Amino acid sequence: KIYQVGGAVRDEMLGKVSKDLDLLVVGVELNKLAKILKPFGKVNMVGKAFGIIKFKPERSEEDIDISVPRIDSKSTGKGHRDFEVKLGKGITLQQDQLRRDFWMNALAKDVETGEIHDVEGQGKVDIENQQVRVIGPQAFKDDPLRMLRAVQFAARFDFSIEPNTLDQIKKNVRLIKTISADRFQEEFRKMFEKGTPSIGVNYLKETGILRQLFPKSSGNFPIEFDKLDKKAFPAFLAILLKEHSFTDIQKKMRLSNEDARAVSEVMYYMAMTDTGKQEDSEIGLVHFVGQTSAKGISNVEAVLSVTRKTPISNRLKMMKRAGKPTSMKELGIGGRDLVKLGLKGKKIGDALQFSLDHAIESGNNDPKYLLDTVKSKFGVK
């Protein structure tokens, strides 16, 4: 028997389109299944320990996860990456369903008949009641990441977390710190990009997950997360974890270099504007833009949009209309002009920076005026 399992069945019942295709084949050993599939495409046994085959059919660009039923017990190893797994031809569909995290994720659809198999109707009930409910009392001890997944699913589908499940998370919340960092990032990202972030953030606070992972978090946030652009994940993290250092965040999240830099740039901008320093001035703004990545700028712009402050791009346009340079490229003089004055080495860079700041402050970008100012400042005769 072949069944479609996992999120795709849940999403179908929610009326959502899913790109996932996970199949479960009952009544056959894994190795025999691999032999059956081999003539029809590429078989990858990378998930053999978990009873999973990655199968790419001929003329297809996408892999399909095809598995045999299994029974999991608690996760083991560093970061809880490994499970104690039992495979076997005699394991039933229902046994496989009961190993899953939440009832709404334990649905199985008969590929041949279209019939939905739901243990005691629990999954359908939870979807109708719009709630996330854990299957067994050991679920969070077996895999602590499920606590964060419960929050992620609640945010993603605008669901509530069933009261008993919520209590179980609170009782086991300390175990969340045993999970490896890269597994956190995926759940936080889904919570923000695919759901209603405020629901997730409220549950992170209520369950104690936020305090366990980031002890300095006050739980007070200056913006409405739901209004943030969905591409602004670094901005979301920078605001959610604003009391923490960038190093703390990167240690817990293991972000890509690009995202990590953007988080640090948003945090820097927020810190400077909160104290009324540099970035509130035109000079400070130009300095910031000149040192910041494109992704950092777009994430700062996302924050400014939500807080209804003037976008960086608009401020730069106003400066240009006033005849002020917004970068070294727009400065009325260049390095060659300073060499002709007799300046060398570091003094050239210092003089250029001085000229840029002075042109912005004075509103005068005239080359002769700037060269005369440099002569006076740097003692050139």
Language model regions located:
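Catalytic cores of the polymerase beta-like nucleotidyltransferase superfamily
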Residues: K1-K381
